[in-house]
């Protein structure tokens, strides 16, 4: 099936669609949707090639979706623990996801920032 036909089917009827009060946009919780916005450009279900960046225990998990004959082999997953932002850049470039390269890097950087432990400030009695 073509990407356009899949989008026409799922754009209003999907289990991943969410709405928020006071916001006119519809959001999506699909796995390969980097912006989490319900649009054909960012849809993980409607695109044959997609990239997903999510948090792991330590580091970042990057999943890429490619068009393969078997659905079990269509998704490749790798965990990045050292320099995740540079690794995401390299993975996105090698996999051919140039239009989502910067977006994937930003998401990986935000995940890494959230995982850094903040130093505790000790109170001294004066």
From Swiss-Prot:
Keywords: Acetylation, Ribonucleoprotein, Ribosomal protein. The keyword Ribonucleoprotein applies. GO terms for molecular function: structural constituent of ribosome. GO terms for biological process: translation. This is Large ribosomal subunit protein eL28. Belongs to the eukaryotic ribosomal protein eL28 family. Pfam families: Ribosomal_L28e. It comes from Caenorhabditis elegans. InterPro entries: Ribosomal_eL28, Ribosomal_eL28/Mak16. The keyword Ribosomal protein applies. PANTHER family: 60S RIBOSOMAL PROTEIN L28 (PTHR10544). GO terms for cellular component: cytosolic large ribosomal subunit. The modification N-acetylserine is found at residue 2.
């Amino acid at each position: 099936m073509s990407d356009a036909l899949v989008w026409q089917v799922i754009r209003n009827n999907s289990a991943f669609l969410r709405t928020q009060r006071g916001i006119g946009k519809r959001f999506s919780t699909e796995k390969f949707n980097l912006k989490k916005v319900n649009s054909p450009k960012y849809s993980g279900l409607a695109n044959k090639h997609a990239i997903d960046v999510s948090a792991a225990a330590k580091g970042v998990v990057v999943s890429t979706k490619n068009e393969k004959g078997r659905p079990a082999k269509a998704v490749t997953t790798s965990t990045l623990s050292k320099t995740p932002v540079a690794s995401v850049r390299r993975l996105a470039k090698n996999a051919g996801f140039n239009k989502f390269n910067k977006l994937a890097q930003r998401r990986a950087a935000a995940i890494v920032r959230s995982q850094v432990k903040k130093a505790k400030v000790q109170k001294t009695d004066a």
